[in-house]
């Protein structure tokens, strides 16, 4: 059954436009509360209890109040953490033995967007069947709990402190960050008051940028999706490394002292190498359809199996669980270390990278010796709505030719956009000119 409201990462949209309106979000809280109340999710409590966290968007106050009203109307107790990274909500939901966690965030989007996503009692994203149950409940009229059965709501004051200690616990106890200068860019988002404490308390000399949220500046020129300010600050302060998170701090980008930017594909490779250097067996890792071919080839050359999931950390997680592996990620900086956390966590991913550098005594560039990302050429071709690229004879003929010519030297990926009438043509090759040539030839068949 198709989902009406839930996408791959919860429900998201422009604030004030359906479905991100106070009335819908109230009904969403009520519907989710009904599913929890009748789904055996009380976990030992007298009634189900959920945690609501949010990032720093101005609209978070409005949507938090609406969710709180909906949940309590359904007889569900509510804890509110205030601004907290998405992975922090996942952790506290599990640590406090709660029924579910809810995050109010639109991740790396501008402030005028917002969204709602849920975590299960185990800190995982909700399974499809639970989201379908919530959508079914949304279609029913609201029937409020009796006055003596309404839920209660309260704020928890130590949420940030608990999460800070959890993040620090994932860093090896025999290592520290003394003598390391680190620039942190929190995107004026949910990590602004948390990331500096984590790295400072582990011994780093911390310089913070993107840490003055005003409700409207989240992701605006700062953070993982706009690393230019991080590159400048890392050079200006003579820092050893720069770390950028996005608005809800579930993704990471890294800059070295020379201003070179490292994406999630490279960081995944570094984490695999660190495990192998420590004598741990790494049978396989998971990337996505967009993961650079150079990383796949380098891992396979070392006997590490590599599987590509659909784009989205949700699908990376599914493949990791299916294969029983621990490490996965996307070029965008969503990285998963399932023996550290149940979900992608920018701060914890950064700590794993720093631990690898400390343990090895190497720089990132040295750890990536022998791995140079293949040049990529991406062309977006606008097409008619409903266009089926798989049945386009000209494209298929050109695709067959390109795949034969690139065999062992590159790859082609063609996929439709999920949000607009566009077909994305991406070619990777060891040579940039070769990638450009094939991408332009393929795109020309659609124009």
From Swiss-Prot:
<feature type="modified residue" description="Phosphoserine">
    <location>
        <position position="107"/>
    </location>
</feature>
<dbReference type="InterPro" id="IPR016066">
    <property type="entry name" value="A-D-PHexomutase_CS"/>
</dbReference>
<dbReference type="InterPro" id="IPR005844">
    <property type="entry name" value="A-D-PHexomutase_a/b/a-I"/>
</dbReference>
<dbReference type="GO" id="GO:0000287">
    <property type="term" value="F:magnesium ion binding"/>
</dbReference>
<keyword id="KW-0597">Phosphoprotein</keyword>
<dbReference type="GO" id="GO:0005829">
    <property type="term" value="C:cytosol"/>
</dbReference>
<dbReference type="InterPro" id="IPR006352">
    <property type="entry name" value="GlmM_bact"/>
</dbReference>
<feature type="binding site">
    <location>
        <position position="250"/>
    </location>
    <ligand>
        <name>Mg(2+)</name>
    </ligand>
</feature>
<dbReference type="GO" id="GO:0008966">
    <property type="term" value="F:phosphoglucosamine mutase activity"/>
</dbReference>
<dbReference type="InterPro" id="IPR036900">
    <property type="entry name" value="A-D-PHexomutase_C_sf"/>
</dbReference>
<dbReference type="GO" id="GO:0006048">
    <property type="term" value="P:UDP-N-acetylglucosamine biosynthetic process"/>
</dbReference>
<dbReference type="InterPro" id="IPR016055">
    <property type="entry name" value="A-D-PHexomutase_a/b/a-I/II/III"/>
</dbReference>
<dbReference type="Pfam" id="PF02878">
    <property type="entry name" value="PGM_PMM_I"/>
</dbReference>
<comment type="function">
    <text>Catalyzes the conversion of glucosamine-6-phosphate to glucosamine-1-phosphate.</text>
</comment>
<keyword id="KW-0460">Magnesium</keyword>
<feature type="binding site" description="via phosphate group">
    <location>
        <position position="107"/>
    </location>
    <ligand>
        <name>Mg(2+)</name>
    </ligand>
</feature>
<dbReference type="Pfam" id="PF00408">
    <property type="entry name" value="PGM_PMM_IV"/>
</dbReference>
<feature type="binding site">
    <location>
        <position position="248"/>
    </location>
    <ligand>
        <name>Mg(2+)</name>
    </ligand>
</feature>
<dbReference type="GO" id="GO:0005975">
    <property type="term" value="P:carbohydrate metabolic process"/>
</dbReference>
<dbReference type="InterPro" id="IPR005845">
    <property type="entry name" value="A-D-PHexomutase_a/b/a-II"/>
</dbReference>
<dbReference type="GO" id="GO:0004615">
    <property type="term" value="F:phosphomannomutase activity"/>
</dbReference>
<comment type="similarity">
    <text>Belongs to the phosphohexose mutase family.</text>
</comment>
<keyword id="KW-0413">Isomerase</keyword>
<dbReference type="InterPro" id="IPR005841">
    <property type="entry name" value="Alpha-D-phosphohexomutase_SF"/>
</dbReference>
<protein>
    <recommendedName>
        <fullName>Phosphoglucosamine mutase</fullName>
        <ecNumber>5.4.2.10</ecNumber>
    </recommendedName>
</protein>
<feature type="binding site">
    <location>
        <position position="246"/>
    </location>
    <ligand>
        <name>Mg(2+)</name>
    </ligand>
</feature>
<dbReference type="InterPro" id="IPR005843">
    <property type="entry name" value="A-D-PHexomutase_C"/>
</dbReference>
<dbReference type="InterPro" id="IPR005846">
    <property type="entry name" value="A-D-PHexomutase_a/b/a-III"/>
</dbReference>
<dbReference type="InterPro" id="IPR050060">
    <property type="entry name" value="Phosphoglucosamine_mutase"/>
</dbReference>
<dbReference type="Pfam" id="PF02879">
    <property type="entry name" value="PGM_PMM_II"/>
</dbReference>
<dbReference type="Pfam" id="PF02880">
    <property type="entry name" value="PGM_PMM_III"/>
</dbReference>
<feature type="active site" description="Phosphoserine intermediate">
    <location>
        <position position="107"/>
    </location>
</feature>
<keyword id="KW-0479">Metal-binding</keyword>
<dbReference type="GO" id="GO:0009252">
    <property type="term" value="P:peptidoglycan biosynthetic process"/>
</dbReference>
